[in-house]
Curated annotation (Swiss-Prot):
SMART domains: AAA. This is ATP synthase subunit beta, chloroplastic. Signal peptide: none annotated. InterPro entries: AAA+_ATPase, ATP-synt_VA_C, ATP_synth_F1_bsu, ATPase_a/bsu_AS, ATPase_alpha/beta_chains, ATPase_F1/V1/A1_a/bsu_N, ATPase_F1/V1/A1_a/bsu_N_sf, ATPase_F1/V1/A1_a/bsu_nucl-bd. GO terms for molecular function: ATP binding; ATP hydrolysis activity; proton-transporting ATP synthase activity, rotational mechanism. NCBIfam families: atpD (TIGR01039). GO terms for biological process: proton motive force-driven mitochondrial ATP synthesis. One of its GO terms (cellular component) is mitochondrion. ATP binds at residues 172-179. Keywords: ATP synthesis, ATP-binding, CF(1), Chloroplast, Hydrogen ion transport, Ion transport, Membrane, Nucleotide-binding, Plastid, Thylakoid, Translocase, Transport.
Amino acid sequence: MRTNPTTSSPVVSTLEEKNLGRIAQIIGPVLDVVFPPGKMPNIYNALAVKGRDTVGQQINVTCEVQQLLGNNRVRAVAMSATDGLMRGMEVIDTGAPLSVPVGGATLGRIFNVLGEPVDNLGPVDTRTTSPIHRSAPAFIQLDTKFSIFETGIKVVDLLAPYRRGGKIGLFGGAGVGKTVLIMELINNIAKAHGGVSVFGGVGERTREGNDLYMEMKESGVINEKNIAESKVALVYGQMNEPPGARMRVGLTALTMAEYFRDVNEQDVLLFIDNIFRFVQAGSEVSALLGRMPSAVGYQPTLSTEMGSLQERITSTKEGSITSIQAVYVPADDLTDPAPATTFAHLDATTVLSRVLAAKGIYPAVDPLDSTSTMLQPRIVGEEHYETAQRVKQTSQRYKELQDIIAILGLDELSEEDRLTVARARKIERFLSQPFFVAEVFTGSPGKYVGLAETIRGFQLILSGELDGLPEQAFYLVGNIDEATAKAMNLEVESKLKK
């Protein structure tokens, strides 16, 4: 007990109730902390360092216990910069892992790895929190049925369908429409599935995170007037953060998504941009903790770390988390341990093509490079499978003929090949689609196309029933009826010009 000098009444020191340690060593973002005998914190416990530095600036650093070294010493990794910390400073063991706010209060807000809002919009309701370290759902809780997650985007639903509760790799360079595709998926899941989305920015540029936030506000995905009506929560741990924050920010985003799945029983989209940076941060932390590196300098625990994240992303009987993960491939080497370990968990890949983007075909999803384990007759049905295969065959034949066309021209092709080229060009244009989130930029109203409508449209093109329509009628339309209506309008316009 100690006495408060202003009231002379006895008050209990809050520090006396806490498990206190002291900093023994600081090496970059890694701290060694000594605790009293018998008072050692558990692995993954959060430690708080609070105080003032030599110039009187307030310090508030949270660390996570990674190793128990013996002699009452633990090694922890800081979640923020360790500037100003000194040996001998007091460290408080919180007695639990990092916990972050979850639920509806998180929608429309930006958080850091600790679940603190960083968007200057005031505090967040923290009555409901959840620890970021949790076990994956037990096998008995899983929903093991194969079911398609309809996105309303023609090229995705037809050629590389997403699995409900699956994991999708999103491959694409800068400026090919990755962000717009992500925002459209967020918009469509909210409208068609009544679901919400969580975006985890892992180790990417701060500017990109800010741009995404601004574009989401412009497109209405984040509702500025009524934040509670927003469709997405954002969690950022960007490039300038210490490796501990970048390694854990994916778990923070996943924890928020799990609450929507397990408690609200919703379908959730979880975006991770970029999953490679999660591995990279783990590699940095592993080296700082003194572990022996494995192949290509990666951490020896690479598969375990990846599995602990990916196995929590799944469908249960309550709801589902469908994850779309941007994958950076270092030096375009698909055999690098980081992307190779990621591929083992993916159900589908969506590859964005710069060639298609240059032609103005949006979304610029490559129909030949994008794949899905769901595209099997027993899962999607014979009709869907046959249509998708014929679309791919026609597109592949057109690709093979392009060199001949460039050198000799269309006239040198056989009648059959000319017909194939004409249909392939219609298919290529029909794979484009106006997006709801791009309305403010293009002026064209967005279109959600159901799977049955998508299949019917491509079957009509492949059957030759629409051979007489001009190919520009198929560009940036929703279903096939819009294409035929557009063809009639084009015909009327051309007659009026004459």
